[in-house]
């Protein structure tokens, strides 16, 4: 059960499923001109039965054995589908999860982080570590994804740090019914604006 209703994980190690997934993308997104796809909830966490069987190209395996490749396959298929529909287009995919090799197919981020100073500190180390591991196109949810609205100084410092990350995204689902936005604090929005403008000057 997902927050939107019933759902299932897909076995990307089965050829017919891979073909179905690409066709699903083509019919429901790419046919409308979409060339950027955000693959989310693809880390195959929360599975009750780690011994559930998957095809693994007809050889058979458990999801526990092949879980690491699933998000990579999802993003690879996304890239393939976009290139099949738009041969001369540079596809852009975002993926919440990925393992060795994900940098070939998608941009990733440090997961749904908390709105706190500890999370900001953790994200810096995570992003640097991912870069050293070959995943250079990485970032985090600026200001935190989950929790209450970030306090003013935390938000300013997070933006000032975030402008140097490859992925810059202010993205939240605050539990206090607020939305984290660049202009949320009138006293410091000029600092946010200056930081974002500086990022654009760097590109």
Where are the model-predicted features located?
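Catalytic-domain carbohydrate-binding cleft regions of carbohydrate-active enzymes
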Residues: 1-203
């Amino acid at each position: 059960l997902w927050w939107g209703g019933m759902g299932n994980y897909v076995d990307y190690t089965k050829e017919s499923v891979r073909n179905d997934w690409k066709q699903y993308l083509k019919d429901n997104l790419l046919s409308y001109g979409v060339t950027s796809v955000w693959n989310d909830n693809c880390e195959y966490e929360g599975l009750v039965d780690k011994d559930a069987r998957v095809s693994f190209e007809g050889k058979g395996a458990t999801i526990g054995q092949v879980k690491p490749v699933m998000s990579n396959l999802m993003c690879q298929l996304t890239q393939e589908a976009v290139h099949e529909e738009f041969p001369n287009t540079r596809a852009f995919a975002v993926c919440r999860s990925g393992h060795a090799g994900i940098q070939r197919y998608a941009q990733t981020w440090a997961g749904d982080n908390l709105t706190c100073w500890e999370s900001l500190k953790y994200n810096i180390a995570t992003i640097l570590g991912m870069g050293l591991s070959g995943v250079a196109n990485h970032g985090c949810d600026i200001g935190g994804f989950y929790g209450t609205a970030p306090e003013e100084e935390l938000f300013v410092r997070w933006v000032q740090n975030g402008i140097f990350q490859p992925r810059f995204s202010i993205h939240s689902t605050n539990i206090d019914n607020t939305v984290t936005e660049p202009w949320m604090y009138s006293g410091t929005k000029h600092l946010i604006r200056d930081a974002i403008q500086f990022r654009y000057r760097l590109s």
